[in-house]
């Protein structure tokens, strides 16, 4: 027995109550159950510093749709939640808080700083989780993990030690991306390239004569965008096959200002076609130069401190900021006559994606992951289709990264994060990598060690997320059952940071892929197509949208029209449309439930006798098939649009209207009313099931009132295609019927006929099947077409010659003109319109005949008046034609 719904849908009063019910009933929880097929998604763990933004809302809505869909299909669906410790982001937040208290991080000390960090995590870390719950996310919150919890810490240590033993992790002096503000190295994936206006400084170095003196007539000229790095130059390079410089092989040049003699080296790295074909080589501050330096055994001279000021190797420039030094060096070169010219140049500059500071390539002792072997199975998995990327075009970006891989710098000069499990003997400096502090040095026997102060890149622990959350390194039942996971849903912007690293980590640690499919989504932009950012002030808070319109409206807005990998624009108007759709579903459901309340509804004895019922059942059945296919192909936006169109157009605007006559005349034909109400209820149930993954709250609230005997819509079975609900003939009849009703409505609208004025509708059709169907729908047609009769016949017998006709497929519809309009009233209306137009034409002619107006008014204003006059004259011609026609009929 269904219950009556409230008059209006109020999401604020419903969503929290329903979500708590789902939690209390443990509907989100998954346990190992070998009688069911598992379906697993791991959440991209949001940062504990984070607050829900539109990107999170889209990402998690997509995941929730998939997990709810699979849960309803009978899968043992696990959505594994958790949060990320976010090393740099969190440390920056804590440092800011300490500054507000007048406390310096280093004065506080590492131990106290970490205490504050854990306090911060406790206070703010759960904020984004509670916000995800507001969205309706059906994660298994009993399994919530944190990338620095005990289990994850154990997994990270295990991986580091194992990979070090296998030679994949090493420590060495290599070029790293150094952030002088955050005072840490960052990975290539964390470098964001920004187009900046700069310069090419063309500089010349004197050649050295055979007697050891610098030439005053021979120079080598090159161009650089970073003249300050010349302080660390240890060579200049030319291409070995460049005939212009063959005579310089083995020669040297003088490095000005520093007065260091450096060699000319021949290296194929040099592009002969670019500039002069000469390149300065600074191994300490350029990754390509570093490689050249290794090939030619060049010294590495670092000229920068960690804060990007010049160090002691910079001589008299020591202590200067890098940009101050640049200016001073250029001025001195100019005074020396060694600055050839300065050229404007726009180029891409590497910046830290967190703080937007220009990074400095620097040689540092860091920990690295050797990538050349690790990346091979990750590349092959996508190449052979073992892992599918959606959309497929993402493969190009994926292979571009795998094919140009560099070793991954994983050490960070931070305190918050997984500390590197490497220990240095206090006596001999021996490095021991181990799961815990060694007791005795294997080299000298010392018993005192100091742990490496650095922490690991955040993405090192995140790369293990698909299996560490299931208990790895222990071989748990969860791990055996739920791994590999099925789908990863993520933004295309972290394909390098996270996706690729999870893939190679899965193959290396588990010997298997971490997931079968990666579903990429784009960015949510503002209505102008701009990226949402604090600086533009165009960010939209999802929680405000939820508070005002409800979570379902936000979810519908984010998914409607969304295609994998594509950016989308966010419009408030679309949220309002989504809210209106929720209200439409609510009101339609309320109408149905009010009418079936207290009635014993039974399955129709002969559904075939009701073409309208057969039509909506068949359309619903086709919808089930189509939506299921779309969902299985991850076409969530297409699937939702089909559900939306069916509910709004076919079910609400057509079928409910079709059914009303039988419902309102139940006393005259109880069986017909029963069949209509049974169809309404059963189709609504299926429609709500199809809608549920997208709009879980409104669908659950309606369903729980429609079917109070069932536990929950979210635990009900997903509909399947049913041959007994397939009625192609009824669909054909209904489509013709709809065309007839639309045609009559259009005629009435064009002639301004109010619904209160009824008219006969004649349908001339020779197809007997269609005629029988139209006859069965006769009373509904009378209601829907504002008719006083609906007559089906095979010819035009009895139809007036002046009847208005509408041609539809396989039939012609006629409406007698005299029944549509009252001739006397229409004559009066037309005469009034004729009088009004006469005045408007006179006024317009008066203005256009006025020389002052024509000569002094703006040209656009004059043209506007001419256009008006032309329109009035056309309208007058039509009015006169109608008047003449009516006079002829009345005579």
Where do the language-model regions lie?
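Secondary-structure transition/capping motifs at alpha-helix termini
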Residues: 68-76, 97-110, 130, 134-139, ...
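Feature 926 captures the class I aminoacyl-tRNA synthetase adenylation module centered on the KMSKS loop
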Residues: 202, 400-460, 464, 508-551, ...
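Alpha-helical support elements that line or immediately flank enzyme active sites
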Residues: 56-58, 287-292, 501-509, 643
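Residue patterns forming the tRNA-binding/recognition surfaces of aminoacyl-tRNA synthetases
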Residues: 3, 8, 17, 21-25, ...
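Conserved phosphate/anionic-ligand binding catalytic regions in large, soluble enzymes, centered on
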Residues: 221-238, 360, 420, 457-466, ...
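Conserved oxyanion/phosphate-binding beta-strand-loop segments in alpha/beta enzyme cores
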Residues: 2-42, 95, 117-131, 245-269, ...
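Short, solvent-exposed turn/loop segments enriched in Gly/Ser/Thr/Pro and often Arg
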Residues: 34-36, 44-45, 80-91, 144-152, ...
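N-terminal catalytic cores of NTP/NDP-binding nucleotidyl/phosphoryl-transfer enzymes
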Residues: 31-94, 147, 156, 222-225, ...
């Amino acid at each position: 027995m269904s219950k009556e719904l409230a008059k209006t849908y109020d999401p604020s009063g419903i969503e929290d109550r329903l979500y708590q019910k789902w939690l209390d009933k443990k509907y989100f929880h998954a346990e190992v159950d070998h009688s069911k097929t598992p379906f697993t998604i791991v959440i991209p763990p949001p940062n504990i510093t984070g607050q829900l933004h539109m990107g999170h809302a889209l990402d998690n809505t997509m995941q929730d749709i998939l997990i709810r869909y699979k849960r309803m299909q009978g899968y043992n669906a696990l959505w594994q939640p958790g949060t990320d410790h976010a090393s740099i982001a969190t440390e920056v937040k804590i440092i800011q808080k300490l500054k507000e208290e007048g406390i310096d991080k280093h004065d506080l000390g590492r131990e106290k700083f970490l205490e504050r960090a854990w306090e911060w995590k406790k206070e703010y870390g759960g904020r984004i989780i509670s916000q995800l719950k507001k969205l309706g996310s059906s994660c298994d919150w009993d399994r919530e993990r944190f990338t620095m919890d005990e289990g994850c810490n154990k997994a990270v240590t295990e991986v580091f030690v194992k990979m070090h033993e296998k030679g994949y992790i090493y420590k060495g002096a290599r070029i790293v991306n150094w952030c002088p503000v955050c005072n840490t190295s960052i990975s290539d994936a964390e470098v964001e390239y920004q187009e900046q206006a700069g310069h090419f400084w063309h500089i010349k170095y004197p050649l050295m004569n055979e007697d050891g003196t610098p030439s005053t007539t021979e120079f080598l000229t090159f161009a650089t965008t970073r003249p300050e790095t010349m302080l660390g130059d240890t060579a200049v390079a030319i291409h070995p096959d460049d005939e212009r410089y063959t005579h310089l092989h083995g020669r040297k040049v003088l490095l000005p200002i520093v007065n260091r003699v450096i060699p000319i080296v021949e290296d194929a790295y040099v592009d002969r076609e670019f500039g002069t074909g000469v390149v300065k080589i600074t191994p300490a501050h350029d990754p390509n130069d570093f490689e050249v330096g290794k090939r030619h055994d060049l010294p590495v001279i670092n000229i920068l401190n960690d804060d990007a000021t010049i160090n002691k190797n910079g001589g008299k420039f020591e202590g200067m900021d890098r940009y101050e030094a640049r200016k001073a060096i250029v001025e001195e070169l100019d005074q020396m006559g060694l600055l050839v010219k300065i050229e404007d140049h726009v180029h891409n500059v590497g910046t830290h994606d967190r703080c937007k500071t220009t990074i400095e390539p620097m040689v540092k002792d860091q920990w690295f992951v050797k990538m050349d072997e690790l990346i091979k199975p990750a590349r092959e998995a996508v190449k052979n289709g073992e892992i599918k990327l959606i959309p497929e075009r993402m493969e190009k970006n994926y292979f571009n990264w795998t094919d140009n891989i560099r070793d991954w710098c994983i050490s960070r000069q931070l305190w918050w994060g997984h500390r590197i499990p490497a220990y240095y003997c206090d006596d001999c400096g021996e490095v021991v990598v181990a799961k815990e502090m060694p007791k005795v040095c294997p080299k000298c026997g010392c018993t005192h060690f100091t742990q490496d102060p650095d922490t690991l890149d955040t993405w090192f622990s995140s790369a293990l997320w698909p299996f560490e959350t299931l208990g790895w390194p222990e071989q748990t039942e969860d791990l055996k059952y739920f791994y590999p996971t099925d789908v990863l849903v993520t933004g295309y912007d972290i394909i390098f940071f996270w996706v690729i690293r999870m893939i190679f980590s899965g193959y290396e640690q588990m010997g298997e892929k971490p997931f079968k499919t990666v579903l990429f989504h784009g960015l949510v932009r503002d209505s102008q197509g701009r990226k949402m950012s604090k600086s533009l002030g165009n960010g939209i808070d999802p929680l405000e949208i939820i508070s005002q319109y409800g979570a379902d409206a936000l979810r519908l807005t984010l998914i409607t029209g969304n295609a994998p990998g594509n950016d989308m624009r966010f419009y408030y108007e679309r949220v309002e449309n989504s809210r209106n759709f929720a209200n439409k579903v609510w009101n339609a459901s309320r109408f149905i439930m009010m009418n079936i309340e207290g009635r014993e509804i039974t399955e129709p004895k002969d559904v075939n006798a009701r073409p309208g019922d057969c039509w909506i059942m068949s359309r619903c059945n086709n919808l089930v098939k189509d939506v299921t296919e779309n969902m299985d192909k991850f076409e969530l936006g297409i699937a939702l649009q089909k559900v939306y169109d069916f509910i709004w157009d076919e079910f609400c605007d057509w079928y409910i209207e079709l059914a009303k006559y039988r419902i309102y005349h139940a006393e005259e034909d109880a069986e017909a009313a029963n069949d209509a109400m049974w169809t309404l209820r059963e189709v609504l149930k299926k429609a709500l099931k199809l809608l549920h993954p997208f709009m879980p709250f409104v669908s659950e609230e309606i369903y729980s009132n429609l079917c109070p005997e069932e536990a929950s819509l979210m635990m009900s079975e997903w509909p399947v295609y049913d041959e007994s609900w397939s009625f192609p003939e009824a669909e054909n009849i209904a489509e013709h019927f709809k065309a007839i009703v639309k045609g009559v409505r259009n005629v009435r609208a064009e002639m301004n006929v109010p619904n209160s004025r009824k008219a006969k509708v004649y349908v001339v059709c020779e197809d007997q099947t269609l005629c029988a169907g139209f006859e069965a729908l006769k009373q509904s047609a009378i209601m829907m077409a504002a008719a006083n009769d609906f007559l089906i016949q095979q010819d035009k017998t009895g139809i007036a010659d002046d009847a208005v006709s509408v041609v539809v497929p396989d039939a012609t519809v006629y409406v007698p003109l005299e029944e549509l309009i009252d001739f006397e009233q229409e004559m009066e209306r037309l005469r009034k319109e004729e009088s009004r137009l006469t005045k408007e034409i006179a006024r317009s002619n008066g203005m256009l005949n006025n020389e002052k107006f024509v000569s002094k008014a703006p040209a656009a204003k004059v043209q506007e008046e001419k256009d008006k006059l032309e329109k009035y004259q056309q309208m007058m011609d039509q009015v006169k034609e109608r008047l003449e026609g009516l006079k002829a009929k009345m005579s």
